[in-house]
Amino acid sequence: MKRSFLFWRWPLVASGVALIAATYGLVRLAFGLHLPDMSDDLGIDTGAAGLISAAGSISYAVAAVIGFLAAERHPRLLVIAATLTAGGGAVGIAVATDAATCAPAAAIASAGAGLASPALVRLVARTFAEHESSTPQAIVNAGTGPGLVAAGAIPLILTADWRMCWMIAAVATAVAGIAVLITDRARESAPVDTRANRPAILPPREWWAAHRSAVAASVLLGVGASAIWNYGRTVLVEAGASEAQSVTSWILLGCGGAAVIVTSRLLRGLQPRALWLIGASLISVSTLAIGAAPAQGTLSAAACAVFGWAYVTASGALIGWTTQINAAHAAAGTALLFVTFMVGQALGAAVLGALLPLVGPVTGFAAAAALGIAGGASLIAPARREATAPRV
């Protein structure tokens, strides 16, 4: 591999990791981390928390649809929009005075992640256009892990004030977004954008058919993953865990996600379906463990670490899956599958928010785990129609 190739391409991977870390780890997925403290100050009960989380997931989905339509032609504009929405929303959460003012800010903040993913998939794909891009794509997607580690470390090391944590997240998002724009040097050598070489906005019919089972699986696993993301720390605190213990579990969750950066090279020989099944199975086992035994500190900590690795692995499998179907529409496919993944999380957050006060974490988390297993098992035997669909 040429030295010049390493010199100017990999800085984009590093800045991409930072933007995913900020928009996902520090902003989109940090709501559950800060929820116990925010609930006390803003008067957010479990039902309201579920609705706010669902609104954030819907906002993410809408943003990802925009990314679906715009990523192929305007990835840099999406990076700017992702930075503004995630950063601005984080500031809005920091200054919120009650649940009514927190909800729209949380929704705006969640949009940043939905815009960032398809944009970065496109930027990485064109930067590594003449080389295998699965590893850099997996590394960028694993930025969620370091972001979660940082989200947990900030209240332990810098400040316990949840408002200041959100302000720090806003600043980090701005820095990461600017870094991506600076390190995206592939635009300098990109071909002239003519009608002949422009990708179509909407993929062909066969492309949609090839994604049917992936869409169904991602919705189911999204529901399964929603339990830990939205209520995991709350369940740990209610079971008697101290603030330090519950935050440490969140940091371990991030460490598990960050470990994907290392394991991506070791597992790159596996097909996306296999990675998806592994991720879905471990997400479900982790969810079941935390719901059944939240007071067991060692078990809960291990479950969080496993969940973090499994979640990032599963989401990375979605990128690999759609790229395998049609690399030219990888950004659009990522947006589509991340939308359906978050639709599942929105449904799960709302339903679990209503159910947990009635049935408790054991039953609620077990139901989520069962749906997660269903999401993984649905791909063991792919539908005949998809299996025979032409690779377009």
Regions found by a protein language model. Name each.
Residues 105-142:
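Cytoplasmic helix-loop-helix junction between adjacent transmembrane helices
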Residues 62-97:
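Conserved MFS/SLC helix-loop-helix module at the cytosolic interface between two early adjacent transmembrane helices
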Residues 273-318:
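C-terminal transmembrane helical hairpin of 12-TM major facilitator-type secondary transporters
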